[in-house]
Amino acid sequence: MAVPKKRTSKSKKNARKANWKRKGYKAAQKSLSLAKSMLKGKTTSFVYSIYVDDE
């Protein structure tokens, strides 16, 4: 089984964690922006169906 030989430094660990959090923040902002534009009816980036079949 592969085992790292030395500990990862705090700065490297913090940098990786910050990058991971930044990616999540960007994805959340993008989805929120898309949802807002859908509610306002100003979407131009994709096609979606307005009508929902109620059963």
From Swiss-Prot:
GO biological process entries: translation
Pfam families tied to this protein: Ribosomal_L32p (PF01783)
Highest taxon of source: Eukaryota
Keyword Coiled coil among UniProt keywords: no
Compartments in which it is found: Plastid, Chloroplast
Stretches for region Disordered: 1-24
GO cellular component: chloroplast; large ribosomal subunit
Keyword Membrane in record: no
GO molecular function: structural constituent of ribosome
InterPro entries: Ribosomal_bL32 (IPR002677), Ribosomal_bL32_plant/cyanobact (IPR044958), Ribosomal_zn-bd (IPR011332)
Swiss-Prot/TrEMBL keywords: Chloroplast, Plastid, Ribonucleoprotein, Ribosomal protein
Family classification: Belongs to the bacterial ribosomal protein bL32 family.
The name this protein goes by in its record: Large ribosomal subunit protein bL32c
UniProt organism field: Phaeodactylum tricornutum (strain CCAP 1055/1)
Lineage: Eukaryota, Sar, Stramenopiles, Ochrophyta, Bacillariophyta
